[in-house]
Amino acid sequence: MKKVRVFAPASIANLGCGFDVMGLALDEVGDILEMTATEGSGITITNKTDVPLPEDIEDNVITPVIRKFFEMTGLSGHIDVVVCQKIYPGSGIGSSAASSAAAAYGMNELYDCPLTDEQMVICAMEGENLASGGEYRGLL
């Protein structure tokens, strides 16, 4: 059993004339996930916050990130995710992006960093695809 605790900051991207070219990350606002890998298979997500999250894991952006990681690496395991701090969805400061990034980074840490930064972005994009209802193409 291996456990990690990861933080992904909230972000603001539409800064004045920079539109989506300039952005910033916030120091203390963000998502904190505790992730544990054990033998077996499956995903459990427990919400320890007051922020409402989907009850069905198929509707949570964390799930496709974990699945993409396993697909890309050929690894397996049961992943237990505890959401300890959460950006409120729809707040405009990157709630789905923070969850997706934290899940991708956490998975990479749990499994001793088999993915490059670019590969972690590919995993995180799976969560963003779910959140946006479409697929982001041509980013990498």
Language-model segment annotations:
Residues 1-91, 109, 113-115:
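ATP-binding N-lobe of GHMP and related small-molecule kinases
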Residues 76-140:
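Gly/Ser-rich oxyanion-binding loop with an adjacent helix/lid
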